[in-house]
Amino acid sequence: MKTGNQFKTVALVGRSNTPGIAEPLATLADSIATLGFEVVFEGDTAREIGIAGYPALTPAEIGARADVAIVLGGDGTMLGIGRQLAPYRTPLIGINHGRLGFITDIAASDMQALVPVMLAGKFEREERSLLEARIVRDGEPIYHALAFNDVVVNRSGFSGMVELRASVDGRYMYNQRSDGLIVATPTGSTAYALSSAGPILHPQLAGIVLVPIAPHALSNRPIVLPDDSKIAIQIVGGRDVNVNFDMQSFTSLELNDTIEVRRSKHTVPFLHPIGYSYYTTLRKKLHWNEHASNEDDKAS
């Protein structure tokens, strides 16, 4: 049960089909339980690692019962559970099992030291925005989805360019011939949007970025919009066009379909260790100033 800001029930979520993840998850569960917290597991995680002795819950049950969810895996795992728990405002702690992640910012080697401190109430909290999107065909909505990183309209690998008509708040912006168009949150600005030459948006910036994918005209540049913008993207030309949400769910599109995107009413709380720095994450992930000293890290 959730009681104010006090943590009582902790949910554990692990990346699926990952060798070597069972042992650290089981060790983390036992250490948290020893501290007096109730520990529950996301159901698929519990089945995959074969753990017994802890309740196995659906994401909806976790949202209703847990005070915080700890995710051990990569950014993709965090994105998936974040979308599912968004309606419940369950805070997330991200532990990276592998390379440094943008949103799973705690190294697995540090989790035993940092998690008890954070569960005791010593953490930094921030809210991350999401997008909600729907596909409209012949005037009727046929599909709805949330996206933590981005909504991407693109062509299949062997078809030609697509032509897209983009409008913002009911006002025509442009027709664009390209391989596709990315609509990204600030969190998603360091994902596919970044590889398509989009700008990095700080997670606390209230914005949405539109980034063309390999546009035919070099004048089609990325643009940052206010986060209350209502974006409509219509399929004007091309074939084998798809839309995906965080690269985790995909839907085929037809000519004249429209994808409507806006900021979701939901946000996802992220919990970070005291001293967390977004700029340190950027520097390490993007290999900026790789020879920085420890003093530089502390100053950031």
UniProtKB/Swiss-Prot annotation:
The lineage of its organism: Bacteria, Pseudomonadati, Pseudomonadota, Betaproteobacteria, Burkholderiales. Its main location: cytoplasm. The active site is at D75. It comes from Burkholderia orbicola (strain MC0-3). The gene is nadK. This is NAD kinase. Disulfide bonds: none annotated. NAD(+) binds at D75, G76, N149, D150, R177, D179, T190, A191, Y192, A193, L194, S195, A214, Q248. GO terms for cellular component: cytoplasm. One of its GO terms (molecular function) is NAD+ kinase activity. Belongs to the NAD kinase family. Its EC number is 2.7.1.23. The keyword Nucleotide-binding applies. Its cofactor is a divalent metal cation. It catalyses: NAD(+) + ATP = ADP + NADP(+) + H(+). The keyword Disulfide bond does not apply. It holds the Pfam family NAD_kinase_C. Involved in the regulation of the intracellular balance of NAD and NADP, and is a key enzyme in the biosynthesis of NADP. Catalyzes specifically the phosphorylation on 2'-hydroxyl of the adenosine moiety of NAD to yield NADP. One of its GO terms (biological process) is NAD metabolic process. Keywords: ATP-binding, Cytoplasm, Kinase, NAD, NADP, Nucleotide-binding, Transferase. It is found in: Cytoplasm.
